[in-house]
Amino acid sequence: VRKRFADQELGDAPFLDRLRRDQKSLRGRGNTLGLDIETATRAGKQIVERILEEESDEALKMPASRYLTDMTLEEMSRDWFMLMPKQKVAGSLCIKMDQAIMDKNIILKANFSVIFDRLETLILLRAFTEEGAIVGEISPLPSLPGHTDEDVKNAIGVLIGGLEWNDNTVRVSEALQRFAWRSSDENGRPPLPPNQKRKMARTIESEV
């Protein structure tokens, strides 16, 4: 490309000087390796063109995000109220729960996007009782955009710890198990070490 500029007299003196030095250096390396620079350059160009022809357009594209929905539009947009509200901010995520809920079976559902088989962006997560009542929520803060799958995982751990403190049984949806937690016990919820459960419970208890 630079030689074409020089051939068309588009380069200034320093440009032409650098070009001559680089050409001399290339010839020296070519002699050392026993290569003809022009022939090697043409061969390299042909290799690149062949690779691009053989690869399909799909193979060269970045994978697109997938949007997974545990909740219906009604479940996402429904208003809910807390008798004993508790709210905690963890990074760019807001965690809410109703501390009046006790001895319930609760499932966590979420709508989120996935890329490379990992949670990319959480849209909304809510905790539902068997009766369908909403008792907890994790949502991104509009003022602090951006979070990782680890941020979401930690926030879910805080929510689970708070709900379990009141003797509720919590499990997560299949989609969350697959893309957010990667591992779960036989009850469909992430295994939390006893010391982590106690730590989260103490944190929520002290904040009350």
From Swiss-Prot:
Q: Which domain of life is it from?
A: Viruses
- Is the keyword ATP-binding in the record? no
**Family matches, as InterPro entries:** NS1 (IPR004208), NS1A (IPR000256), NS1A_effect_dom-like_sf (IPR038064), uS15_NS1_RNA-bd_sf (IPR009068)
Which parts of the sequence are annotated with region: Disordered?
Answer: 184-208
Gene Ontology molecular function, alphabetical:
protein serine/threonine kinase inhibitor activity; RNA binding
**Which keywords, in A-to-Z order, does the entry hold?**
Eukaryotic host gene expression shutoff by virus, Host cytoplasm, Host gene expression shutoff by virus, Host mRNA suppression by virus, Host nucleus, Host-virus interaction, Inhibition of host innate immune response by virus, Inhibition of host interferon signaling pathway by virus, Inhibition of host PKR by virus, Inhibition of host pre-mRNA processing by virus, Inhibition of host RIG-I by virus, Inhibition of host RLR pathway by virus, Interferon antiviral system evasion, RNA-binding, Ubl conjugation, Viral immunoevasion
Q: Where is this motif: Nuclear export signal?
A: 115-124
Annotated compartments:
Host nucleus; Host cytoplasm
A cellular component annotation (GO) from this entry: host cell cytoplasm
Q: How is it modified after translation?
A: Upon interferon induction, ISGylated via host HERC5; this results in the impairment of NS1 interaction with RNA targets due to its inability to form homodimers and to interact with host EIF2AK2/PKR.
Chain residue ranges for the region called PABPN1-binding: 201-208
Q: Where is this region: CPSF4-binding?
A: 158-193
Extent of motif Nuclear localization signal: 17-21
- Pfam families with a match to the protein in the record: Flu_NS1 (PF00600)
Write out the GO biological process terms. Answer: symbiont-mediated suppression of host cytoplasmic pattern recognition receptor signaling pathway via inhibition of RIG-I activity; symbiont-mediated suppression of host gene expression; symbiont-mediated suppression of host mRNA processing; symbiont-mediated suppression of host PKR/eIFalpha signaling; symbiont-mediated suppression of host type I interferon-mediated signaling pathway
Q: What is its main location?
A: host cell
Q: What is known of its domains?
A: The dsRNA-binding region is required for suppression of RNA silencing.
Job description of the protein: Inhibits post-transcriptional processing of cellular pre-mRNA, by binding and inhibiting two cellular proteins that are required for the 3'-end processing of cellular pre-mRNAs: the 30 kDa cleavage and polyadenylation specificity factor/CPSF4 and the poly(A)-binding protein 2/PABPN1. In turn, unprocessed 3' end pre-mRNAs accumulate in the host nucleus and are no longer exported to the cytoplasm. Cellular protein synthesis is thereby shut off very early after virus infection.
The family this protein is said to belong to: Belongs to the influenza A viruses NS1 family.
Quaternary structure? Homodimer. Interacts with host TRIM25 (via coiled coil); this interaction specifically inhibits TRIM25 multimerization and TRIM25-mediated RIGI CARD ubiquitination. Interacts with human EIF2AK2/PKR, CPSF4, IVNS1ABP and PABPN1.
Name under which the protein is recorded: Non-structural protein 1
